[in-house]
């Protein structure tokens, strides 16, 4: 049998200086005749099924067995004896099954004389099936998949248009289930998913033309959706076995039948059936039971020849053990007799575990006189190669290239580097195939160029070597300032890829280490640079397929480069690339990539959106704590990654566009590049403005002290301007107008004087509005926000009082210490003080509207504007002053506190009455207080509590509310009838609030350990807060009714 190997240069012409190496390490002799054979097969790849093929190089002595052996070896097949080799003429029904001992060159010369080579199709097929073949094939996945694809192809070509509509629907839906086994059972309910299947993949791949033509599109869609749901829980293997189960009653794919006659003349016309269960049997009429002739283990010899009559029919003779005379079968032609002989011989070899043929015949052209040479061990092969051999012997090889991943070796002239010029340094990382080292390239142009060297641990295997070098093939086609450059390759073992070195390492690690030193402008700059690289790839029709922060390298503090092109693919003439196998980054992938393994520039856009999110989150991975299998379900439920803290809403809006479920609605990289450029420029302008404001504030604080030794006064509480801090908290009215579109509630920044000037993107819902500030303290505003002329005069006054240097230094140090103390004091006070702006139901809804719950199918975190200033908030009380029930000061606003881990500070409440009434025996008042205390207790325990403890806590609140409402029902009859309606409305509102709390609790339990868990906890607190506020409102309504009643009974 011919030795076979893989040569990556097969489909490309190497340069004259390039050595062509065999996969086994043996060099080809010059002048050796070689021919190329294209063999079609059913090993699944990313291309269309009709194009699945391998390109084979063969020499004069290569036999059919050698070609079969190499193809199946490359796919790690166990049941090699089941495979046969078929030659078909495309313009007629002429079919020849080629025996494994036939020489390929002789076969080609024989048949290509009759018809041109392009009219012949060489095909690898499974022909010989063992008993219980499905059970055996389940342990040999490549063979099971091969046989399934073969049977499915035969079914679609031969009988699909004749089968019942229900069977055709089931078989088609099983193929959809098998092909896209990671797709959820209800995925086809989504219009965009069905359209991908219908328009991009094509329904004709799954269903016969007769079905598609006879059923209306809308009806067909419903039928497919209903049928697909029946198989929603099947995996790939179960789908295949179910397919065979449904198909076998209408199509016997496990046997072959031949019309012939028993005996040497046409006496008994029969249909000979040959298969694993029947052995050799015949049927005289359709529908009758087969008559058994012989088992394969009884066959001793097989002979065939032309008959002696003028019709030249084919004669087949089988010598059966125990039979008095040979079994003679007359076939319509010699070709059919040969095909029958090959089939029976294959079954005999399979059953007996033999390699020797059972066919006895005279030597003919195209056949070998001796059986194939058995396969030798590697050591024996190497030993043989040391001997002098003739040219014809060195040509005895078969060479295979899978068209799926054809690789072109970079030419020696341009990219081959001598290993002596590389100094290998320390290991700086680990790649998919091996370690990555730092090193030095000693080139004539640059004597000591720092480089990164990718090594391959197991590149002795041709397939691993090919896949490893695929990245170099891809990278050499790119030249962009934000894409890592290929410097060269070393193709001799050990194989190395040499690339430019990015000294600061992976972007994800860089972001984590520099989390507190990188400003927002730098993060947006990185995203913009990546968008330029990806726009470049898009223009060259490449899909990257693995865009993530871990695959971006940092060249300098202001330059990042896209790397790791191991998964990149050129899309050729199609608009998408389909991956057939391999590990893929599920949590970064677009839904169509997860469901259909479909990769396009639009799917790269989705991944880029996730990568931008990683950058803004300083290296946090997406969907932390979620299993890969659960990601697609969450995406299809409308879940999206939440808005990162301090992220400009315009940038988050751009991310959400990248995450549109429908690929056609996502922007292109050219659009992303332009929009990111605009966002980057806006951020730079805002950054410069904040720096000017900070400088002006520091100068004002420093100069205003003049020659006085008095320290600056302590700033007022959060939400109340002081003379010193007003300029830091509030930009000028012109600046306020410019920056309103960057204000987002729910993301408070750090507090205190040093951070005040930098609060452009921070939540400002608790701060007084600029116009209200003027209304509150016009004198202070006029005093501490002078005009430009006044500012200049003030500056001159401050500069005029010059202090000795040592006194100035001491004063500045003291002021700095006091400012730090003020900062700590502010942070401490803010935990207990929240302005009243959060107490109205309307402001709660507006502030926490950054996530409005499930709306439609999209759970997207929506940025909101500042609160409506139509009703100015009231001034909160001083710290320690007697509280009022309406303040509910012990309940922190969920929108702010949840960003600090929901650290709520429950306090004892002793609320004074809202009206001058006797509370000694006021059950309504007591129960309202009890309800508020239950809410406070729940709020304090919700953060560390596991999901199973949510129900008891909410139940306590519900019991307190039920007691309150029962008490109100007892109180209503004693109150004026005119007030009953208002009281009942307040009761209904409380019931609605409890329902909202229970709804949010269920969502928090459902999305435990996901990115939405914290958000739904926050919404639970918001609902509980609303319940407490409305309970107090109910008390106010009842108090008003009591006062009205007292006024009616009072004597006039």
Curated annotation (Swiss-Prot):
Ranges where the Protein kinase domain occurs: 431-680
Modified residues (Phosphothreonine): 13, 914
Molecular function (Gene Ontology), one example: protein tyrosine kinase activity
Keyword Magnesium tagged: no
Amino acids binding ATP: 428-434, 454, 500-502
Enzyme class: transferase
Pfam families documented for this protein: FERM_C_FAK1, FERM_M, FERM_N_2, Focal_AT, PK_Tyr_Ser-Thr
Sequence ranges assigned to domain FERM in this UniProt record: 35-355
Protein's name in the database: Focal adhesion kinase 1
The organism's taxonomic lineage, starting at the top: Eukaryota, Metazoa, Chordata, Craniata, Vertebrata
Encoding gene per record: Ptk2
């Amino acid at each position: 049998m011919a030795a076979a190997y893989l040569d990556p240069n097969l489909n490309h012409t190497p340069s004259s200086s390039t050595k062509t190496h065999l996969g086994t390490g043996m060099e080809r002799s010059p002048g050796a005749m070689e021919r190329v054979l294209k063999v079609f097969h059913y090993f699944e790849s990313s291309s269309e099924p009709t194009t699945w093929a391998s390109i084979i190089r063969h020499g004069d002595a290569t036999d059919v067995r050698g070609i079969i052996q190499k193809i199946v070896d490359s796919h790690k097949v166990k049941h090699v004896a089941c495979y046969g080799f078929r030659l078909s003429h495309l313009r007629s029904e002429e079919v020849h099954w080629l025996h494994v001992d036939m020489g390929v060159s002789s076969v080609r010369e024989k048949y290509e004389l009759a018809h041109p080579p392009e009219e012949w199709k060489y095909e690898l097929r499974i022909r010989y099936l063992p008993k219980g073949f499905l059970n055996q094939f389940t342990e040999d996945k490549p063979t099971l998949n091969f046989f399934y694809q073969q049977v499915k192809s035969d079914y679609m070509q031969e009988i699909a248009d004749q089968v019942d509509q229900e069977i055709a629907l089931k078989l088609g839906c099983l193929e959809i289930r098998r092909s896209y086994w990671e797709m959820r059972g209800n995925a086809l309910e989504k219009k965009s998913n069905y359209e991908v299947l219908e328009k991009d993949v094509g329904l004709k791949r799954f269903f016969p033309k007769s079905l598609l033509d006879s059923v209306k599109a809308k009806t067909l869609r419903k039928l497919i959706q209903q049928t697909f749901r029946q198989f929603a829980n099947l995996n790939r293997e179960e789908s295949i076995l179910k397919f065979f189960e449904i198909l076998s009653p209408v199509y016997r794919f496990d046997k072959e039948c031949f019309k012939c006659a028993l005996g040497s003349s046409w006496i008994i016309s029969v249909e000979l059936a040959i298969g694993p269960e029947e052995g050799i049997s015949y049927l005289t009429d359709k529908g009758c039971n087969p008559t058994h002739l012989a088992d394969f283990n009884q066959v001793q010899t097989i002979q065939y020849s032309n008959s002696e009559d003028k019709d030249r029919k084919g004669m087949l003779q089988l010598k059966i053990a125990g039979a008095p005379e040979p079994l003679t079968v007359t076939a319509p032609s010699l070709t059919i007799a040969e095909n029958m002989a090959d089939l029976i011989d294959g079954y005999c070899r399979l059953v007996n575990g033999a390699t020797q043929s059972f066919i006895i015949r005279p030597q003919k052209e195209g056949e070998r006189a001796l059986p194939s040479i058995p396969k030798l061990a590697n050591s024996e092969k190497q030993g043989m190669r040391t001997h002098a051999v003739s040219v014809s012997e060195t040509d005895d090889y078969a060479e295979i290239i899978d068209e799926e991943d054809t690789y072109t070796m970079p030419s020696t002239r341009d990219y081959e580097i001598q290993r002596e010029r590389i100094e290998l340094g320390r290991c700086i990382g680990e790649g998919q195939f091996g370690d990555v080292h730092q090193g030095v390239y000693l080139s004539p142009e640059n004597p000591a160029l720092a480089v990164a060297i990718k090594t391959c641990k197991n590149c002795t295997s041709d397939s691993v070597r090919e896949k490893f070098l695929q990245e170099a093939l891809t990278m050499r086609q790119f030249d962009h300032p934000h894409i890592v450059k290929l410097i060269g390759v070393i193709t001799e073992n050990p194989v190395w890829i040499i690339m430019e070195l990015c000294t600061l390492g992976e972007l994800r690690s860089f972001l984590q280490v520099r989390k507190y030193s990188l400003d927002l402008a730098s993060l947006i700059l990185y995203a913009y640079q990546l968008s330029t690289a990806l726009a470049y790839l898009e223009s060259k029709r490449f899909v990257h397929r693995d865009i993530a922060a871990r695959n971006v390298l940092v060249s300098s503090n202001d330059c990042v480069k896209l790397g790791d092109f191991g998964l990149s693919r050129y899309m050729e003439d199609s608009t998408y690339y389909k991956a057939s196998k391999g590990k893929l980054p599920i949590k970064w992938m677009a839904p169509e990539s997860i469901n259909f393994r479909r990769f396009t520039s639009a799917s790269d856009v989705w991944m880029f959106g996730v990568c931008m999110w990683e950058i803004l989150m300083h290296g946090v991975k997406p969907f932390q704590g979620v299993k890969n299998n659960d990601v697609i379900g969450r995406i299809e439920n409308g879940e999206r990654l939440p808005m990162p803290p301090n992220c400009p809403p315009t940038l988050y809006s751009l991310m959400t566009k990248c995450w549109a479920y429908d690929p056609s609605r996502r922007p292109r990289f050219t659009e992303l590049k332009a929009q990111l450029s605009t966002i980057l420029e806006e951020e730079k302008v805002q950054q410069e403005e904040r720096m000017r404001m900070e400088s002006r504030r520091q100068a004002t604080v420093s100069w205003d002290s003049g020659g006085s030794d008095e320290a600056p006064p302590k700033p007022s509480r959060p939400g109340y301007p002081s003379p010193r801090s007003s300029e830091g908290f509030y930009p000028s009215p012109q600046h306020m107008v410019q920056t309103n579109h960057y204000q987002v509630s729910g993301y408070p920044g750090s507090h205190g004087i040093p951070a005040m000037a930098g609060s452009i993107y921070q939540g400002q819902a608790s701060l007084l509005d600029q116009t209200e500030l003027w209304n509150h303290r016009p004198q202070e505003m006029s005093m501490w926000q002078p005009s430009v002329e006044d500012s200049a005069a003030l500056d001159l006054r401050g500069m005029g009082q010059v202090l000795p240097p040592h006194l100035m230094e001491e004063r500045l140090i003291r002021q700095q210490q006091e400012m730090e103390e003020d900062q700590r004091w502010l942070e401490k006070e803010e935990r207990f003080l929240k302005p009243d702006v959060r107490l109205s139901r309307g402001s709660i809804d507006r502030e926490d509207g950054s996530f409005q719950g499930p709306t439609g199918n999209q759970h997207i975190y929506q940025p909101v504007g500042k609160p409506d200033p139509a009703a100015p908030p009231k001034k909160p009380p001083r710290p320690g002053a007697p509280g009022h029930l309406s303040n509910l000061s012990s309940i922190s606003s969920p929108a702010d506190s949840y960003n600090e881990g929901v650290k709520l500070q429950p306090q004892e409440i002793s609320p004074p009455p809202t009206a001058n009434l006797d509370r000694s025996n006021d059950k309504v008042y007591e129960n309202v207080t009890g309800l508020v205390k239950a809410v406070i207790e729940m709020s304090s325990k919700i953060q560390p509590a596991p999901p199973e403890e949510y129900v008891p806590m909410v139940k306590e609140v519900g019991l307190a509310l039920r007691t309150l409402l029962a008490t109100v029902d007892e109180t209503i009859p004693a109150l004026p009838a005119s007030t009953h309606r208002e009281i009942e409305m307040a009761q209904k509102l409380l019931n609605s609030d409890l329902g909202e709390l229970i709804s949010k609790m269920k969502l928090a339990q459902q999305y435990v350990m996901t990115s939405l868990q914290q958000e739904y906890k926050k919404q639970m607190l918001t609902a509980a807060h609303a319940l407490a506020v409305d309970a107090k409102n109910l008390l106010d309504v009842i108090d008003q009714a009591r006062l009205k009643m007292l006024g009616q009974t009072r004597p006039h």
